[in-house]
Amino acid sequence: MYKLKIDAWPINEVPTPKVCMSDSIFKRKARKHQSDFRWRVLHCGHNPNHRIGQYGSYLLWEDAVLGKNFYTPYWPKIKHAIENRYPNSKQYELTPIYANMLRSEHIPFNFFVPMMDDFDAAAKVFDELIEENAIAKIIDIKIEYAPEKQYALNDGTSFDTFVLYQHIDGSIGGIGIEIKYTEAGYQLKRGSKEEKDILQGKTSNILTSLVAVTTIKTVCHPY
C-alpha cells in the first residue's frame, strides 16, 4: 500500500495543473485526485506543455515506463502481461495505458494479474462477488481478451476481463467484467437489443455451453 510521505516531499510546492474545462464534475475531481496522488505519493512531475499532460493526470514517459501507473509490487508481471497482450504495439500506442491515470485500461492489469498468482484465493473473491457458493476452481483469467469474430458476443463486443471457472456441479461458467473509471458507464435501455437478449437468455457462440454467465460492471471511484 502506498503511504503519503509528507515530510519527504514538498507538498506546499504542488504545481497547479491547468483545469480541463470540458471535464464533468466527477472527472474534474478524479483528475485532481490523480494529479495530487502523482505528486504527493508517486513523487512524479508532469509536462505543462503537453496536450494532455498539462492537466496533471498524465505521467511523464520516464515515469510511465517504470510502471508508476500500476501496482508496483507486481510491475514486472504486469509489464509481461501487457507485452504479451500487445506484442506488436508501438510506444505511442501503449502510452495511454502506461501514462494516462484517468483511463480504465490499466485497471484490469492492476486487479487481475495479482489474482493469477493464487486461483484458489481468486475463486473465493469471485464467489463473494456473484453471491453464490458455486465456484469450484478458477480455470483461467484473460485480460483484454478479444476472441475471433465468430466467438464474440452477439453485439460484436467483448469484456475487459473474462474469468473461466468450473462450477461445483462440474459444468463450466464464465464471468465477464467491464471496468469503468472516468469513462461513461453503459446504460441498459428499456426495449433495447441488449435488454431483449438478456431477458431471452441469448449468449454468444462461445458461451452457449456455459452454465452461467455473469456480467459485473464495476465503477472504480477515486476516493
Language-model segments: residues:
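Short, solvent-exposed loop/turn segments at secondary-structure junctions
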Residues: 146-150, 168, 180-184
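Short acidic loop-to-beta-strand element that houses the catalytic metal-binding Asp/Glu
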Residues: 156-166
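Acidic, metal/cofactor-coordinating or nucleic-acid-engaging core segments within structured domains
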Residues: 185-223
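Hydrophobic/aromatic-lined pockets within catalytic cores
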Residues: 116-120, 166, 181, 185
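Nuclease-adjacent, charged terminal/linker segments that flank catalytic cores
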Residues: 1-151
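Short, well-structured alpha-helical interface segments that form or flank functional binding sites
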Residues: 102, 106, 110, 153-157, ...
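Active-site beta-strand-loop-beta-strand hairpin of nuclease catalytic cores
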Residues: 164-176
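"Short basic amphipathic alpha-helical interaction patches in structured regions
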Residues: 125-129, 178-180, 189-196
